[in-house]
């Protein structure tokens, strides 16, 4: 009984951390990486698709991405999609290749991004604590229904608390890495 509740809680906490990593990957640091353009949508024959489905995205050097659309007709659409995204990038096309230089971040912008990153991490912590609460409520319901003893409930709650602590520690680790990455000049 309690095992399924613990497994569910662990899986959901893992998803919260994965979600945090995905959100943080979208936040631009001064360094170029291909996941930066993952959420940029390009119009392709009437429907919006992710840029990765219409072009190759590669890292040329530490501050430059190259985007190579698979069809020559898509060059201007891909360039426009990157320009109009909320990333503040200015792509330039040279024939069939689009180069996307990463502008250096100002100190003020870095501090703003650190605040955003901390907010995302706090959201992940809250989500993990909510999962703990849900699991504990499920355990209480089992005790009420006399399916498990109060001792079993206490043991399971302790294990869920350990899970919560380890996942929140993981969130803090991910946050520290991203902050360090943001503050590098």
UniProtKB/Swiss-Prot annotation:
List, in alphabetical order, the GO biological process terms annotated in this UniProt record: cytoplasmic translational termination
UniProt-annotated location(s): Cytoplasm
Gene that codes for this? frr
- Chief subcellular location equals cytoplasm
Query: Which PANTHER family did the record assign?
Result: MITOCHONDRIAL RIBOSOME RECYCLING FACTOR PSEUDO 1, RIBOSOME RECYCLING FACTOR
Family membership: Belongs to the RRF family.
A Pfam short name = RRF
**Swiss-Prot/TrEMBL keywords:** Cytoplasm, Protein biosynthesis
What would be one Gene Ontology cellular-component term for the protein?
A: cytosol
Q: What does this protein do?
A: Responsible for the release of ribosomes from messenger RNA at the termination of protein biosynthesis. May increase the efficiency of translation by recycling ribosomes from one round of translation to another.
**CDD domains from the UniProt entry:** RRF
Gene3D superfamilies (alphabetical): 3.30.1360.40, Ribosome-recycling factor
**One Gene Ontology molecular-function label:** ribosomal large subunit binding
This protein's record includes keyword Magnesium: no
The protein here is known as Ribosome-recycling factor
**Is Transcription among the key words of this record?**
no
